[in-house]
């Protein structure tokens, strides 16, 4: 067990420091903004230091383990730990949240509550990625929903209450299945109930029971990921939320669903995953085509980007269903890659809206001349999203392709069919992304609204965009840096599978 409680500090610090925001002196919003950004920076530096100096990359086992008794009555423990699978998402969470607080600079209404909710969300997300106890995982999963609901319902567009209610109904409905799965896994098997992750991994279940558990967890994670047909909350939510909230939703929240699928469905329930993986493969393939086609018909800029996120999640689903080292590593790389690209696209869409006050693509046009910096960054991230070689999305999608082709679980004809349909999806992606760029930036200036201030991005916005663009290019040029984190853990997970 680790001597110094690094992970406990990393999980508790944001929400504890965030609660002190309400006691800060009333001297305008500047104090609150700087305080929040300093907390996020401190948290990111602490996380980076702990992982650089106390985490061995060549060790696939759980590290920095902390295990404390919490409730003696039913052996509920505060158990945290990090391995190669959760290391990337935790660092991504710290990075995106820090930039999202910087992006939220223009928020002035109830800014104390706004920044507290962002920090509370930060704690819940890091807790979800690092918990090693199933009930603790569930508590952190739920803790993170409340701030998101409040951020959606209080700051956003005209239909924000509708989209926030839809979000909470979907996610709370999914959480019921998650709780049933957690209690089922915890109560089954040994003489005394245990929610310890390591014990549950080594537990064998009857096939019928394992399938029931698998379906419960799958529904919970399918809402978050999202998987068709449980995706309809996402476009509404993204269309109405403030863009700093969108950065956290697209960058981190969706990735929690993918993380849960790998961590619980693949690692705890390998036999059921082997049975369900062909269905996941089919759904992932349909999702790529369906979301790309639907995105093309969206008038609302943020909804179009939201559907592109749904399409990209299809690649993660296919990578997870391929049950190969290459495919699963590609899915994990896509989790990190899309975390950066999705957050950046929503940030740039939001900053464009701040200037021209228009959300519908057919009302825009000719924005490239007055806003060349925003045009350059938006075009660059669009290229990253359509998997241009040299950027992170390309490596992830190629690895997922190779994962399907090399998979021994599937016959040749299904592999050819899935690869062909995925290729069609990859052709549709540039169509909707480039047409979106054309409608916003090219052509004649269509808007003549009196309240539109067309000036280019300032230093703060440029800093946020470039900070996200550097890792996108870095991972594209040298993907081994991210892959080396998870490659040993992926081998460990897949050692339980017959098909490799």
Swiss-Prot record:
Membrane topology: Multi-pass membrane protein
Protein's cellular compartments: Plastid, Chloroplast thylakoid membrane
Superkingdom of origin organism: Eukaryota
Chief site of localization: plastid
Reactions mediated catalytically: a plastoquinone + NADH + (n+1) H(+)(in) = a plastoquinol + NAD(+) + n H(+)(out); a plastoquinone + NADPH + (n+1) H(+)(in) = a plastoquinol + NADP(+) + n H(+)(out)
Top-level enzyme category: translocase
The keyword Transit peptide is assigned to this record: no
Pfam families: Proton_antipo_M
GO BP, sorted A to Z: ATP synthesis coupled electron transport
EC number per UniProt: 7.1.1.-
Keywords, comma-separated and alphabetical: Chloroplast, Membrane, NAD, NADP, Plastid, Plastoquinone, Quinone, Thylakoid, Translocase, Transmembrane, Transmembrane helix
Transmembrane stretches, start-end: 4-24, 35-55, 87-107, 113-130, 134-154, 167-187, 207-227, 242-262, 272-292, 305-325, 330-350, 386-406, 416-436, 462-482
Gene Ontology MF term list: NADH dehydrogenase (ubiquinone) activity; quinone binding
Signal found in the keyword field: no
InterPro entries: NADH_Q_OxRdtase_chain4, NADH_Q_OxRdtase_chainM/4, NADH_UbQ_OxRdtase, ND/Mrp_TM
GO cellular component: chloroplast thylakoid membrane
Family: Belongs to the complex I subunit 4 family.
Protein name per its UniProtKB record: NAD(P)H-quinone oxidoreductase chain 4, chloroplastic
Organism (species): Helianthus annuus
